[in-house]
Amino acid sequence: MLRIVKKLGIILFVSTISINSFAKSMYDDVDSASDYDSTPYYENEGSLVFKMRLGGVVSSAKQKGLPTPTSPQPVSVGEVAKNGYGGDASTTIFFNNYLATELSLGFNVLRTKYTSLAAVAHNYGVDNVKLGKHKPIYMIPATITGQFHIAPYGGIRPYIGIGYHGSYMLTQATGLKIRNGHGAVGQIGVDFYAKDDTLINIDVRQFFLNPKLEYKPNLVGNKTMTSKVKLNPLIVSIGIGFTF
């Protein structure tokens, strides 16, 4: 899945070169046209764009830094969490046709893998632990990105961005605590504009996130044990937007 999304991102980025040329020609046609309504050009005079998106979250959640197991027969721990879902709301502020910044607040859910928690308990001397019901990991990222809109003309407008996020992390999973994290964000997407100041948005963001995990004594024995987890969630979203 990750490879497919990355390939699609490369295709989108390369295709923007030709899109920019085509869109610029449409922009020139509008300037010279006597009948505005007959031209295939979607004008956007708004400097603010508000978007609401829903999407899927792809994450491998690989752990690193676990201590040497105390069990004489350790087992593979595997991934502590798996793919999930989420959404966000954002405001994009345009400084000119090409440059903008996006502020967003999201809410994402990652499914925990209790087989991984059971493996940790086994490796550190607590067998037959009662894990209870599955409790997910919640990720609430506040993100700021700087964007370059490659072809800010016409109805199809791709963009790329880079930024930073701070994420509040929470879980009620038995014996597990996850700390807050932060890191860089890469972004690529495209807006499909209509003539009534609305748009459809497809957005792909790669979050770099390696928060600390704390395993509580009821899961690993007499003391708290910490490790790091390589979440690095890839969020693929689709949504609707409005210009102001």
Curated annotation (Swiss-Prot):
Residues 1-23 form the signal peptide. Its main location: membrane. Coiled coil: none annotated. Gene3D superfamilies: 2.40.160.20. Keywords: Cell outer membrane, Membrane, Signal, Transmembrane, Transmembrane beta strand. The keyword Cell membrane does not apply. One of its GO terms (biological process) is transmembrane transport. One of its GO terms (cellular component) is cell outer membrane. It comes from the Bacteria. Belongs to the OmpW/AlkL family. PANTHER family: OUTER MEMBRANE PROTEIN W (PTHR36920:SF1), PTHR36920. This is Putative outer membrane protein RC0105. It comes from Rickettsia conorii (strain ATCC VR-613 / Malish 7).
